[in-house]
Amino acid sequence: MKIEGSCVTFEPCDAAFVKKFGPLEAANMVLDYHSVHPNMPFLYDAEQLAGFFGISCGELNHIVNHIQKEYKKAFLPKKDGTYRSLYIPSIRLQFCLGPIKDRILSQLPVSKFATAYQKGSSTRKNAEPHIGKKNLLKLDITDFFGSISFEQVLCAAFNTRYVSKQVGFLLTSLCCKNDALPQGSPTSPALSNIVMRRFDDQIGRWCNQRQITYTRYCDDMTFSSDRPLYGVYQK
């Protein structure tokens, strides 16, 4: 569909949506959504989602139904001599994940305490708020991406108004492997921050009330303060 001012022009992939609600109600729904999310695509059903990717609905369903085969496992050497497992999406899956990352996930809010995977972010910037503090504590989240579940992704990123359960399920299915975020997928970093937003905000508020500085860079949580940090362990 194309939106110019208060005029909505529907395309062939919007046919089922328009038929279900009628042209006037469908246009009002689109304009209502666009007024709140001007930079995000309106995706109500599978046909619109396929059109968003520039593929057929049949091809979209095929990718989702065979998602395990759309990833190749690779191994990245680590400094300690061990290897990190990565799951690299196929070219055709990347054609779907790219627009999800650039057009949808980039518009969703993340916590101010999350410092990774954003424009201008770096480990150095993550460390800056902690400089000069007497006490420093670093905690690591084990199996960070693998611990973020299908349900968490669906609820945090794709469970919004005018996104049907069908589309939410399809988007989540494209972004997950084995019911979790695959490390190596282009959408996993952004999704991890989106899913962790509530956690980061809760921990951040708790720390602020106790004069503790908190930041999270991917799976590394850093706490610092001029006071003892014993309470962090208990939390």
Language-model features: locations:
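Generic alpha-helix structural propensity
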Residues: P41-Y44, I55, E59, Y71, ...
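Short, conserved non-catalytic motifs in the polymerase core
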Residues: A74-L97, T115-A116, K138, S173-S192
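Active-site-proximal segment of RNA-dependent polymerases
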Residues: L93-K138, D143
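Reverse-transcriptase-like RNA-dependent polymerase core
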Residues: L60-K79, Y162, Q166-T172
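N-terminal low-complexity, intrinsically disordered segments
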Residues: L43-G58, D102-I104, L108-P109, Q152-A157
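Short amphipathic beta-strand starts and helix->beta connectors
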Residues: E70-Y71, S121-T123, W206-R210
